[in-house]
Amino acid sequence: MNDSKLMNRAADNIRILAASMVEKANSGHPGGAMGGAYFVNVLFSEFLVYDPQNPRWEGRDRFFLDPGHMSPMLYSVLAFTGKYTLDELKQFRQWGSPTPGHPEVNVDRGVENTSGPLGQGHT
C-alpha cells in the first residue's frame, strides 16, 4: 500500500471512530471531527514533533484544539499513538469519562489545553 492510500485509510479510520463515538454517546455532532480527520492525521503523522512515550518533553510541538466539539477527532488520533484505548473512546461524553465532550487538559495523554466555546481559543 502506498503512502497516499495509507494516509487516506488512517483518516477514514479517524472518521469512523469519530462517528461511532458520537453515535454511541447519543450526543454531540461528528461533522467537524470527520471533516478534520485528514488534516489532523497528516499533522500528527508528518509535521508535529512529539514523542508519545515522553509527553512532557519540553521540545515537543503542542496541538491546541479550540473547537472542543471536534474532540472525537483528537481522541481518535491520540488513540493511534496509544494514549487512549477503544474502550475509553466508547465512554465518550459519559460522566467521569477520560474522553469528555470538550477535552480537559491532560498532557500525559496528549491533550494540551482545555477547550470550551468557539472563539475562546487561539487564532
PLM feature segments, named:
Residues 11-27:
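N-terminal capping segment at the start of a domain
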Residues 1-8:
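Basic/polar N-terminal segments that are highly enriched at the extreme N-terminus
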Residues 30:
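Flexible, glycine/charged-enriched surface loops at secondary-structure junctions
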Residues 21, 36-123:
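Cofactor-binding active-site loop characterized by glycine-rich and histidine/acidic residues
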